[in-house]
């Protein structure tokens, strides 16, 4: 497994066919959400204002790998499993009803409908227009609804390991500013808009350590494609949380490395178009920093930590996969930090069993390693392909109970 531990979801498909006794388990996606802080990215910022680069045109309109299932989020209060292959993963009418973790007290608000920025540390008075791909800032087109939902997925994926709510629902100013005392609700507004006077040649911009101020001090995202827009939101919010840039050698921004499914880059760099983007601790060659992104995100001043562990770390505390029909099982979960593993169990009759464990988002940060055990705890098989970030098995098994460990 890659040393980056931040997150992403591992989706898995479990399928099993049996000749007798227990009915055959047919192919089905089981998915886990991995929230680890594997490669943590960082770099020293020398200025208070932290810009992100402009993404190349068309650099990332299509995901390098499409695993189908989108991150489960709350749509108007109901947990919903979207599909990244759909034009509107969560339904067109739900674009501004999305929330990743609505019970969290800390908020990352993705603001797409325009914003009047005044009375904050930017020292300006600007009415920023709504996000637009076609120049019409009064109405959202189908393409814009689709783009917003898919950018939202990218940001949720990056912050899913943490107890913070990424949302397109306007929480109100009081939920974004920290008034001190007994106030436990605060966050940051990420304004997705058009480049305005004074912000030329920037894909996004933010103030360092602006998360938790007593004012609404937004970050701004000008990159607009699916992944560069999503990554820029995560990058600029990262600055608000206290993160510096991840550079490479003499370059301020790490551009990413590799190709295909295992291409990689740090969120606090500029890895536009790479398949895996992760938080980093600067443990890559020619790094310009040793900053531990995950530890800084979790610092006390920001007010939140990891999410709680959702599945057991041993066979004795494994979660039974849900049997949705006689032949289909289903499940999902979150790997929330570097040392977390999740155990799942299933029972099958004798015969062929196929297992597929995939990161959920189109571009994830979890490189899955999965291990299959029998009821005695003996390892049956392990999967950690070098040319992909998912894991799979195709085994002829005796009837009985089995366990899957996702790492």
Please state what every model-predicted region is.
Residues 258-289, 294:
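Post-HExxH zinc-binding segment in Zn-dependent metallohydrolases
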Residues 37-42, 114-117, 243-246, 272-275, ...:
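Acidic glycine-/aspartate-rich tracts in secreted/extracellular proteins
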Residues 42-137:
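Disordered inhibitory propeptide/activation segment of secreted metzincin zinc metalloprotease zymogens
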Residues 1-59:
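Subset of Sec-pathway N-terminal targeting signals
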Residues 35, 110, 155, 238, ...:
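Residue-level detector of buried hydrophobic side-chain packing
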């Amino acid at each position: 497994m890659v040393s980056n531990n931040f997150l992403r979801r591992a989706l898995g498909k479990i399928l099993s066919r049996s000749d007798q006794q227990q009915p055959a388990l047919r192919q089905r996606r089981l998915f886990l959400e991995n929230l680890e802080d594997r490669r943590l990215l960082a770099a020293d910022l020398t200025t208070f204002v932290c810009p992100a680069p402009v993404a190349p045109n068309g650099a990332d309109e299509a995901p390098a790998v499409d695993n189908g299932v989108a991150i489960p989020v709350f749509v108007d209060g109901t947990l919903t499993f979207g599909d990244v292959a759909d034009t509107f993963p969560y339904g067109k009418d739900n674009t501004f009803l999305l929330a990743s973790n609505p019970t969290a007290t800390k908020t990352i608000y993705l603001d797409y409908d325009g914003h009047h920025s005044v009375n904050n540390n930017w020292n300006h008075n600007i009415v920023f227009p709504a996000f637009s791909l076609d120049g019409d800032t009064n109405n959202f087109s189908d393409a814009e609804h689709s783009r917003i939902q898919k950018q939202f997925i990218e940001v949720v994926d990056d912050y899913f390991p943490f107890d913070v709510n990424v949302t397109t629902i306007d929480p109100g100013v009081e939920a974004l500013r920290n008034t001190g005392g007994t106030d436990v609700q605060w966050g940051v507004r990420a304004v997705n808009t058009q480049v305005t006077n004074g912000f030329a040649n920037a894909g996004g911009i933010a103030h360092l350590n602006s998360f938790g101020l007593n004012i609404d001090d937004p970050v701004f995202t000008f990159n607009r494609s699916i992944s560069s827009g999503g990554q820029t939101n995560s990058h600029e919010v990262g600055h608000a949380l206290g993160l510096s840039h991840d550079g490479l050698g003499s370059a301020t921004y790490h551009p990413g490395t590799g190709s295909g499914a295992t291409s990689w880059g740090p969120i606090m760099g500029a890895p536009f178009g790479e398949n895996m983007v992760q938080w980093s601790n600067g443990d890559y060659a020619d790094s310009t920093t040793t900053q531990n992104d995950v530890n800084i995100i979790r610092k006390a001043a920001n007010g939140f930590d990891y999410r709680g562990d959702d599945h057991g770390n041993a066979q004795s505390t494994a979660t039974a996969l849900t049997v949705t029909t006689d032949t289909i099982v289903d499940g999902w979960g979150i790997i929330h930090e570097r040392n977390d593993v999740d155990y799942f169990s299933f029972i099958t009759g004798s015969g062929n069993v196929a297992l597929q464990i995939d990161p959920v988002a189109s571009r994830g940060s979890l490189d899955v390693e999965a291990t299959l055990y029998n009821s005695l705890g003996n390892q049956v098989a392990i999967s950690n392909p070098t040319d992909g970030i998912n894991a799979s098995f195709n085994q002829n098994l005796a009837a009985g109970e089995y366990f899957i460990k996702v790492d």
